[in-house]
Amino acid sequence: MIAKTYTTMLGGRELSIETGKLAKLASGSVTLRYGDTLLLVTAQAREERSTLDFLPLTVEFEERHYAVGRIPGSFHRREGRPGEHAILSARITDRQIRPLFPKGYRQETQVIITVLSADQQNAPDVLGAIGASAALSLSDIPWNGPTACVRVGMIDGEYVINPTSDQLTRSSLDLVVAGTRDAVNMVEAGAQGVSEETLVGAIEFAHRELQGVLDLIETMRAEVGREKFNFLVDSDLSTDLVPELSEAARAAGLRDALLTTKKQERSANLKALRDRLIAERVPDPEAAGAAEQIEALKAAFAKVEKQELRRLILQEDLRADGRNSKTVRPIWIEARPLPRAHGSAIFTRGETQVLGVTTLGTERDELLVDNLTGETNDRFLLHYNFPPYSTGEVKRVGGQSRREVGHGNLAKRAIRAVLPAFDDFPYVIRVVGEVLESNGSSSMATVCAGTLSLMDAGVPIQAPVAGVAMGLVMEGEQYRILTDILGLEDALGDMDFKVCGTAEGVTALQMDIKVSGVTPAIMREALAQAREARLHILGKMAEVLPAPRPELSPTAPRILTLKINPELIGKVIGPGGKQVRELEAMGAQVTIEEDGNIRIFSADGAAAEAVRQKIEGLTREAKVGEEYEGTVVKTAPFGAFVNLFPGQDGMLHISQMSENRVNAVEDVLNVGDRLRVKIANIDDRGKIDLIRPELEGKIAPREPRAARAGGDRGGRPPRRE
């Protein structure tokens, strides 16, 4: 195959897609270039059909350190398991392409995105999604694309397509949108409290801008695309059984079984009804062909269950737990359930329950994030845990799944927007969401529980954040938007639309759409309905914690800050770090910055205060005119040396000790004597001349040191060099 390159303009920069040059043995492969960011994307499928009853699709996002001219920092100096950034980038692509595989397609399919070059300005995540669409479109893999993906920022009130990394730092919006020619099928966003109308406008803007990419991929497919292979679909015996089984199920109490309030009771009732109907139709399960008939009846019953649930929602505005489409489940909240945690809260909404826990740490607890954008330190961590008992199941307990990473990132983006600036609240913050029960919207409950735990810890957040998951049931022109969806409604519905924000605006958004035809008008309606629910939830949260606690939790560590002259940092550190080690031995961690900012961290407030006072003493600077209660530490024929504060002495000349002539210093002062002194002068070398305040104006002042040719040598000529 001859290599061919196709180009289009996107966001004012050229996007080029080349095929036929690299990885030619893959079913589909393309190379994308945008600026100096270069990606290789391949798509491959097995010939044999999987025995799984779902689509075995995997998307891998491979970050190569050579892409930015670096050697990996791991022990073996090679890339290891994908990090969080790579997982989130892979999920963007997965969520965009998965809904467009044909019904019944079960071949194991793999998309691999490899970052070959990264200019650290043009993000590779959305390019990977475009590349996956192109590779699948050109391959022989059955797929109903293409799709395209863009990022939208908002700078100075204007939408910007694919903002650079530098531009994103000034953007109030970070929105990723994927879609087909006629519809949007995936949205992901983090925002600084923008309005719902701004979001809809950004989504519409993105959908218009991605049309050029769709044109490009369709041109490529027409010119160099391969013919799609045929795939086997299991004969669906269940379809013919649905009409009769549906009538029988309704007569046998399907409605009552579906409208059981509790999840486990509902599942048990539906299973009992299904088993009874199957037993009536297959009296002898051991007979020839009975197993196939039973499986077909189970599949048919699942379809009947879905049809009836959707009918109840659309025609009667009645949901499985008895609510209408706009009602939020009952909410129960408890603040500070954990006595030793820095902040904690339990948030329960229906049968979804999350324990949120906040822990405060120092800069030494920052997470070093090493990816292709460079090394950064993350001062806000949010970890989402989804144990199997939360859904009443037994599964292997191990590392985080990709789902957990994605849900945790959504909650993190929602809350990060309201955190105080580090200069105002110099703590590293970790929030953990422990999902204790799950029947839909556990990530949104994590946002609520995490926010409450921050407020319980005394973190001065700008405003409380709440989240709610919205759903959609759509049949032709008829649709109904659902507030606070159940797990069952998520599985059987047409949209999962998670919205997080404050009372003023949206801070995070995630939308996955399973059907085409979701118009901007429907999105506006869903966002408006989500706002009503969000305000309701925020009201319930305010009943328990109307604002962050005025003081940090008694168990939380204390951080004291002070500013010193940068030239005095050496005094705090000491020779070889001796002084700072002595300070930390007092029970605190000390962080010193080059600009003189010092932070003292200790679980013991008294220890932190003691270290602060010690540092102030070490770095205190004397000023002309200040008075001190000092102690004589040394005498000399010409005067006495008086300690003003730790590390700082001054000299009281013999002529300034009394109104009368003093023959010997020891006639007036001795080591250990305390007296009141005042700073009269500080020379260029930092030497301090003292006077006694009570004698000021009664005796002639001494000339400043700089004016005395002989220094303190009693008028004798200076020493020869």
From Swiss-Prot:
Annotated ranges, domain KH: 557-618
Recorded GO CC terms: cytosol
Gene3D superfamilies xrefs: GHMP Kinase, N-terminal domain, K Homology domain, type 1, Nucleic acid-binding proteins
Domain S1 motif stretches: 625-693
Family matches, as PROSITE patterns: KH_TYPE_1, S1
Pfam families, per the entry: KH_1, PNPase, RNase_PH, RNase_PH_C, S1
Gene Ontology terms describing biological process: mRNA catabolic process; RNA processing
EC number: 2.7.7.8
Protein's cellular compartments: Cytoplasm
Region called Disordered, residue ranges: 696-721
Residues holding Mg(2+): 490, 496
Keywords, sorted A to Z: Cytoplasm, Magnesium, Metal-binding, Nucleotidyltransferase, RNA-binding, Transferase
Protein family (similarity comment): Belongs to the polyribonucleotide nucleotidyltransferase family.
The protein's role, per its UniProt record: Involved in mRNA degradation. Catalyzes the phosphorolysis of single-stranded polyribonucleotides processively in the 3'- to 5'-direction.
Name the record gives this protein: Polyribonucleotide nucleotidyltransferase
Organism: Deinococcus geothermalis (strain DSM 11300 / CIP 105573 / AG-3a)
The gene coding this protein: pnp
